[in-house]
Amino acid sequence: VTEIFIRINSQGAKLNQADFAMSKIAANVTYGGNMLRKAIDYFSHLSVQPEWYADMAKDKEFMNSIFASKLRWLKDDREEIFDPDYNDILRIAFMYKFGRAKMKDLVSLLGGRDFETREYKEEIAENSFGQLTSGVIDFMNEYTFSNFVLAIKSAGFIASKLINSQITLDFAYTLYLLLNADPNIDKTQIKHYVIKWYVMTTLTSRYITSPETVMDMDIKRIQERGFLTYFREVEAANLSDTFWDIALVQYLET
């Protein structure tokens, strides 16, 4: 894997932290990383090209894995407003399960880094692969994924051309997963909360500048204060009368 990256770099291709994370995942056999890498790649491929399922089914090793049944529904999926690539899947699963948003941290955790002692420990690598695998499986859940897409469409975003920021959509799905797992949140209100957050962050371009830094802050503050408390704070700070009377008008004029 390292040799492949060296060859890619020699040709001037720019690699990001998700690429490095995928290299670590693909090279890992001990904790099932090689099969996890396939699941991530296959999901992103099927979300764009459902008919490719027949080709995927030829991979007998994968079809006998825990992931195969999680992807089967995609062969009949024709939804186009959310077709995540491997970068999106990794980012969402990471934010959801680890409470962090900086992808370089995922690379370090998969390598076993202890952020407190600055040492590398095998148990941290094992735990990190386990958490990431769990996050990816939750990401792929048909009911969860489909209901999230329906929520976004119900807010008026009915076509992919209306989605002006993929990373904003990524955070919205992360939030959907987090709220589903939060016992303190009324499950009947999750769609409502996610829609409000998505519309607010879209209108204010919250994740356009330094997205990882802002998402990292949001994730940590949601964990510390609870979603409802933090949402009220962010809403009050960003959707004041000044925003509606001046900032939004200027945005619509450009």
What do the predicted segments below correspond to?
Residues T2-E79, P84, P183:
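Extended, regular secondary-structure scaffolds
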